[in-house]
């Protein structure tokens, strides 16, 4: 059957740009919070500690940064040169707001990018890389291109952190009244929300460019089982 990659990407950018947008009221409410700890930004303790290790890197890239939790954690943990990129202006505005709120704006360079931005980056530019909940919410063709370019722009000894959602089987999807297009793509209201691939399938996708140093599983707050994936990679 196949999917329309360009249409899927355009819809994703529009969806996330709208979802992560902060209103003036949102910002005012955030500023009222007198107790603020950057360690609470990460969706799991395991993910926090993985990104915390990027603090020792000289230059970190947060690809698909969202509201910037990983960029802030890396900066707070010691990295003074973090580049945070995403494809929606509302997303970048949210990142800038939180970077200022957590007093690390001077350490984070934010960029609204296009889909071909990685190809413009010089080789061996970053010794730290984080990509959380991006590779498994875009078409596989896009993930492959991201991985290919990432392998080129990171250094040989770079620390690479990849966060992924859970695997959902065809049967599990059907039990929820949903179906997987091409056996792996889960759409909700015409928006791609999950590329459901097993741990082994992801390892195969990484294999041309990276070796897996560690695979762990974690849960988001409120989840009973640790089914989300945390990969630590090294360039081959």
For the regions a protein language model found, what residue spans apply to each?
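Class I (Rossmann-like) S-adenosyl-L-methionine-dependent methyltransferase catalytic domain
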Residues: 1-55, 66-118, 138, 142, ...
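Conserved beta-strand/loop positions that form the S-adenosyl-L-methionine
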Residues: 63
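A short acidic, Gly/Pro-enriched loop at the edge of an enzyme's catalytic core
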Residues: 119-129
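A short beta-strand submotif of the Rossmann-like class I SAM-dependent methyltransferase core
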Residues: 131-134
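A short glycine-rich, Lys/Arg-flanked "PGG" loop and its adjoining helix->strand segment in the class I
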Residues: 144-156
């Amino acid at each position: 059957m196949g999917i329309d990659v360009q249409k899927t990407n355009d819809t994703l950018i529009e969806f996330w740009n709208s979802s992560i947008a902060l209103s003036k009221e949102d910002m005012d409410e955030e500023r009222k919070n007198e107790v603020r700890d950057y360690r609470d930004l990460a969706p799991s303790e395991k993910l926090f500690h993985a990104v915390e290790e990027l603090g020792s890197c000289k230059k970190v890239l947060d690809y698909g940064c969202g509201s910037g939790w990983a960029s802030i954690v890396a900066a707070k943990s010691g990295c003074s040169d973090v580049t945070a990129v995403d494809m929606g202006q509302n997303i970048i505005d949210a990142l800038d707001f939180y970077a200022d709120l957590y007093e690390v704006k001077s350490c984070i360079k934010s960029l609204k990018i296009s889909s071909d931005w990685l190809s413009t980056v010089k080789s061996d530019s970053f010794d730290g890389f984080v990509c959380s909940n991006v590779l498994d919410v875009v078409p596989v063709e896009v993930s492959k291109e991201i991985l290919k370019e990432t392998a080129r722009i990171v250094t040989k000894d770079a620390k690479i952190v990849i966060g992924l959602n859970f695997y959902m089987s065809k049967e599990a999807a059907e039990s929820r009244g949903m179906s997987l297009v091409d056996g792996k793509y889960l759409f909700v209201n015409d928006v791609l929300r999950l590329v459901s691939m097993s741990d082994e399938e992801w390892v195969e996708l990484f294999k041309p460019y990276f070796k897996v140093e560690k695979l762990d599983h974690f849960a988001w707050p409120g989840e009973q089982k640790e089914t989300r994936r945390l990969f630590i990679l090294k360039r081959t």
